[in-house]
Amino acid sequence: MKTILAALALALATTAAFADTVKIGVIGPFSGPFSTSGKNFKAGIDAWLALNGAKVAGNDIEVIYRDVPSADPGLSKSLAQELVIKDGVQYLAGFYFTPDAMAVAPLLEKANVPMVVMNAATSAIVTKSPLVVRTSFTMWQNATPMTQVVAEAGVKKIITVVSDYGPGIDAETAFKAGFEKQGGTVVESLRLPMATNDFAPIMQRIKDSGAEGLFAFLPSGPPTLGFVKAYNDNGLKAAGVKFFATGDLTPESDLPVLGDNALGLQTTYHYAVSHDSPENKAFVEAARKALGNPAELAAPAVGAYDGMFVISKMIEATGGKPDAAKAVEAVKGLSWVSPRGPVSIDPETRHITQNVYLREIAKDADGNYINKELRTFEKQGDPGLAGK
């Protein structure tokens, strides 16, 4: 390990010190079952470059992409080392899955490279290195407001269903903590293997639990589409079992497939493509153009777009030179108006503070399915970092 870290530091010093090109290495799922999210990373980055130009503080920007099709900490670590040693990147970014970000974080200080997390959502990631900054969200951040929504709906008994990995456990813990404070009861907590694709038995367990509603988190992709379809197909909606989830369950790219059966499903999330603001209109136009298929645009794109903004401020602060500590220090407390709304980087946690929205699947005036914003929970930090 020490040999690897020494090589990282030496490689960065020799390859980047004289460069007028600042290289950014982006690790994400650009093939395989989660490739739509990888495409959204790239679309968000391309949108930022299209609207702001590919030069910052006199330095040309070059983005290098590396593919991790599904959660693979070993591959992510290997690719990060390659990006720093071979390609000479000054910044690492992307990271769709928490285990991948966790695997790379220990390399950052010796390599003198900041990491900008554009999606991975376990609270603890930012505690693994002082050089981690997050522009996405956390499960605690998005799940906690939903407990208030559920309580106000008069629901007293809930079953939680999550994927069995870091973000899922965070979502389960956050919801349970908040819901019990509201006077509710979690009657059962189900943790599903990441590879789960048959949800009919899960739906039967939900029915048998006696819960009035379910709260769910799974990573956006084939699992979430399968879960929401199973909720409808197995009669839970008809039986009156209410559906509550984080927005990961209803990405815009899934809505046309889910169709009218999904109308009315409510989620809490930090972004909706339908968000009404000048900043979002410009972003959506540029990101959809970059994607090629407008229907695929989803939240990972805005995490990547804002990640590029943060990296640009780091480059300005360092003059394009490799100084990870100075780069991160420069963005602590940074605030701006994102396509998602007003945001800032918490100077203590280096996590993004942002609005969280209650959304409902609806149709717009043109008959397109959207996540319609109903309510705003302003300036949400990360409750999951309390006491850490």
List the predicted regions and their residue ranges.
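Extracytoplasmic "Venus flytrap"
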Residues: G25-G44, W48, R66-G74, Y96-P99, ...
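Extracellular/periplasmic Venus flytrap/periplasmic-binding protein
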Residues: P69, K77-S78, T122-A124, K128-N234, ...
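Extracellular/periplasmic periplasmic-binding protein-like sensory domains
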Residues: V228-Y305, E316-T318, P322, A365, ...
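Sec/Tat signal peptide C-region and signal peptidase I cleavage site
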Residues: T15-A19
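Venus flytrap/periplasmic-binding-protein-like
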Residues: P69, V116, S123, M194-A195, ...
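Beta-alpha junction/loop-to-helix N-cap segments that form part of ligand/metal-binding clefts
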Residues: T36-F41, L51, K55-V126, T135, ...
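Periplasmic-binding protein-like
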Residues: L83-Y96, V116-M118, K157-V162, G210-S220, ...
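Solvent-exposed, acidic/polar segments of extracytosolic/periplasmic ligand-binding ectodomains
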Residues: V22, K332-K388
